[in-house]
Amino acid sequence: MCFPESEPIFQMNKRVRHIFVIPRDKSGIKKIVAYLDLFKHLFREHYDLLAHFSNDWRGAMLSRFLRPDISVSRQAPRRGSFWHHSFHFLAPVLDHERPMAEQDVDLLRATNLYKKTVAPAYELDIKPKEKNKLEIWLQKHGIQLKHKLVVIHASSRWKFKEMPISTWAKIIDELKSKKIDVVVSGSYEDSQTNQLIYKDAQLKPLLTQNFTLQDTATLYAVADLVITIDSMSTHLASAVKTPVISIFGPTNEKNWGPWKGKYKVIGLSKEDAEMFACRPCGLDGCEGSKVSQCLVQMEPQKVVDQALDMLQIR
């Protein structure tokens, strides 16, 4: 059960049989009818386990309504006893120093259904026909996969997580000067940022157009390396087993960094300059300014050197 924007992720997981989408795009009587229909479908399935990964009230109500054999969530400081008593088991409250992959698996550990000490790797299933379609698209735009292919994801809905346009343009120019093909990916909302990067780069990258989340996952799967800001792209690359460089600013990479696979986290620290001793601060930019100096002052060559090292190119 998920929000509409998360549905494509579960569609790419071959272990998921049914996906129930929360009808938050509806309103009025249509929303009520959609929820009733959703509850009927869930009740009909007689699920044995309900694992609720957020502190949303819908999970507590579902647990009481469906009465599964096992229900579990995590402790939520802002919820009261009614919410907490809706579940048979409770995992510990979120920890800001542990990977989220581990903390999600804590729910299964709390029920004794998962006994391993390390969480499994992310996994998505990319079908051969999707790869074939993507390779045809690349060939149509002059990329034959005989050179190394790097995919860049530069944009975020939270601008304090972004590096300057000029930084990305310099990274692209350096990579392409070494005969590395570069594709800049992103959603429709990212197109303005991507166009600015394209305009600023001397050696032009290929931009994705109207790509779905599945298209993007497939692109990552055929790439040799993904370079991304702190975003879902980090985890999408990990899930398709492609090496990833994840560039972090205010966010704590101990929580949200890549999980398993081959990766490198780049983030400025006190070792680079005293002014970066505050990172990660967890703020929306320096003093709430929506601009993060730990990203603004990131040297392009620092990213390029790491990329060449991971691609084994010198």
Where are these regions (language model features)?
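Catalytic machinery of carbohydrate-active enzymes
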Residues: 1-314
